[in-house]
Amino acid sequence: MSEPTTAFAHYRVREGHVDEFLALVGKHGPILRRLGLVTDEPTRVYVGEDKPSGPLVIEIFEWTDQDAVSRAHTHPEVSQVWEAMGPLCEERDGRPSMEFPHLSRVDVS
């Protein structure tokens, strides 16, 4: 089993749809956790402006391992939430509607 990896999900949410989108994000983490796809590390969600163009939501969570990402992509309950998120987001300023960089924490001390 590989090490956990942290996802920094960037969602460029359509104007006027932030509350609806956040309701889906509120379901997302608990589903992933119940399915054993993410660690017990709390999911963090941030909302701001993707200046100058519109709302940006960032969701940070920790996959249990790299394989969890693949398993999530084939699970119908996860797919249902992801499919509902898609229409609420938009490409903006030449950037995709959603981006999912995965990073590993390093100790620099």
Give the positions of each predicted feature.
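Short amphipathic alpha-helical segments
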Residues: 17-43, 77, 81, 85
